[in-house]
Amino acid sequence: MHENTNTAETDVSTSTDTVGATGAEVVRFDTKVVVVLRDNLLPWQELNVTAFLMSGIATSQSGLVGESYRDADGNDYLPMLRQPVLVMTAGVEALAKARTKALGRGIPMAVYTEELFSTGHDAANREAVAAVAAEDLNLVGIALRGPKNVVDRVVKGARMHG
């Protein structure tokens, strides 16, 4: 089994412009988070895959998740990812090509395969992925986070989800 020894050290820091058009602070991120879904999924599958893939991104590095939320009445809510997430779609071949490019560039990525729709727990999910060679994975989605220009090249050919 091939093990990817490339690593992409990505900075969780941001650069900021002090004032945007609305008078509010504008935050610009050095990295980009993208989910690419296969373009023939059912709506429930799109949501399910996106949720699972984003759990991989959110837990992949400390500092990606912001502070907890609190409303004016003092109710606390869980923290969320600090930066926006783009959701895109692509055909089977473009999705496989994006996976290969991400691996080649050392971009950490989460994968979701067709087989995971029929598994019932985390261990079974890992077993289903482990049973298939990388080039033969029946991908329905990937999620990645890395430097903007690298991620843009990796997902070239995908289009915004609409």
Predicted regions mapped to residue ranges:
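Positively charged, small/polar-rich N-terminal and surface patches that mediate targeting and assembly
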Residues: H2-G162
